[in-house]
């Protein structure tokens, strides 16, 4: 076996991998590679489990989330697997442990009163960017998806919105050159490409506009150029401040939509499909947390079915 270090293998892996993934995915891989993997393991020709485990614990202790660390390991494993296929390094099967979370952080959602206040204000003070917030609150779309929404994605025959593109700014590395660029891409997964029915209120708001807009234009800008997510986040943040509403991340609107669906008794599979989750377990883990009363009703319902 002709042993090579991780830096050499990573260079070869990059040339190979870029042909099979989206540019945005490759950009995310390279960011993790250059920021975390190469500084730690670039010169290594062996990666025993204890070294990787120590790396994981140091990163988490340093304030990096377990999710990000897991993403780093996914990239590292891809590189090692590629190197092993080429006979440059042993193929390792690490059993990495992560510190137990002391307390699962609750999702930040908008209160019902604030939710109604935002909708009422935006309906009374119409702008195209404001319409994007209304659509997000009615559909749970991601910020990149709402930035990528075009008028032609709104079907007045089916009364549905078709999610089929996303806008994102990616980090690009080309040799010594490092820069960012805005890209319009397909959504993050196959499940993210989806049809979302419009509510009666949203339909009434959009219907008159559809007679006069250019179907190839982006909804938020009403032009052929999209608004980028960072700019739209700033608009949203300023809107909340203007209305005196506590700061909430834009993604909190998606959480709010999903939470209100679950609280209203919508079935979990339908909510999962509306959100574009890859599988229903993501929806269940994020949004379904039965309280004591719900658990009691469940048991009572089961016993009632048995005639008890």
Sequence positions of predicted segments:
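N-terminal core-binding DNA-recognition domain of tyrosine site-specific recombinases/integrases
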Residues: 2-4, 14-82, 86-88, 104, ...
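Conserved hydrophobic/aromatic pocket- or pore-lining residues that grip, position, or stack substrates
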Residues: 37, 52, 76, 97, ...
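Basic, Lys/Arg- and aromatic-enriched nucleic-acid-binding interface segment
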Residues: 66, 70, 85, 89-91, ...
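C-terminal catalytic core of tyrosine-transesterase DNA break-rejoin enzymes
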Residues: 67, 85, 134, 138-145, ...
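DNA/chromatin major-groove-contacting recognition/catalytic segments
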Residues: 118-121, 173-177, 285, 289-308
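Conserved tyrosine-mediated DNA breakage-rejoining catalytic core shared by Y-recombinases
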Residues: 149-208
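Short functional hotspots where side chains directly engage DNA or cofactors
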Residues: 160-163, 219, 260, 272-290, ...
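Active-site/catalytic core of tyrosine-dependent DNA strand-transfer enzymes
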Residues: 197-246
């Amino acid at each position: 076996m002709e042993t090579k270090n991780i830096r050499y293998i990573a260079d070869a892996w990059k040339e190979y991998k870029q042909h099979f993934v989206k540019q945005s995915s490759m950009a995310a891989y390279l960011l993790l590679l250059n920021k975390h993997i190469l500084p730690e393991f670039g010169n290594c020709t062996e990666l025993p489990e204890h070294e990787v485990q120590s790396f994981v614990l140091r990163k988490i202790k340093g304030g990096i989330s377990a999710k990000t660390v897991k993403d780093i390991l996914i990239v590292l494993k891809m590189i090692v697997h590629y190197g092993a296929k080429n006979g440059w390094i042993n193929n390792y099967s690490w059993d990495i442990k992560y510190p137990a979370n002391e307390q699962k952080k609750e999702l930040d959602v908008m209160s019902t009163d604030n939710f109604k206040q935002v909708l009422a204000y935006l309906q009374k003070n119409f702008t195209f960017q404001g319409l994007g917030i209304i659509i997000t609150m009615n559909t749970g779309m991601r910020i990149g998806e709402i930035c990528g929404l075009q008028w032609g994605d709104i079907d007045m025959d089916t009364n549905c919105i078709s999610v089929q593109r996303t806008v994102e700014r990616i980090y690009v590395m080309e040799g010594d050159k490092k820069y960012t660029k805005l890209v319009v891409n397909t959504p993050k997964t196959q499940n993210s490409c989806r049809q979302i029915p419009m509510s009666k209120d949203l339909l009434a708001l959009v219907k008159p506009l559809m007679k006069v807009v250019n179907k190839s234009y982006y909804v938020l800008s009403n032009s052929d150029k999209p608004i980028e997510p960072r700019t739209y986040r700033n608009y949203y943040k300023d809107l909340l401040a203007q209305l005196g509403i506590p700061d909430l991340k834009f993604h909190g609107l998606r959480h709010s939509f999903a939470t209100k669906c679950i609280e209203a008794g919508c079935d979990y599979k339908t909510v999962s499909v509306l959100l574009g989750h890859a599988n229903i377990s993501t929806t269940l883990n994020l949004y379904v947390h039965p309280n004591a009363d719900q658990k009691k009703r469940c048991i009572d319902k089961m016993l009632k079915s048995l005639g008890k």
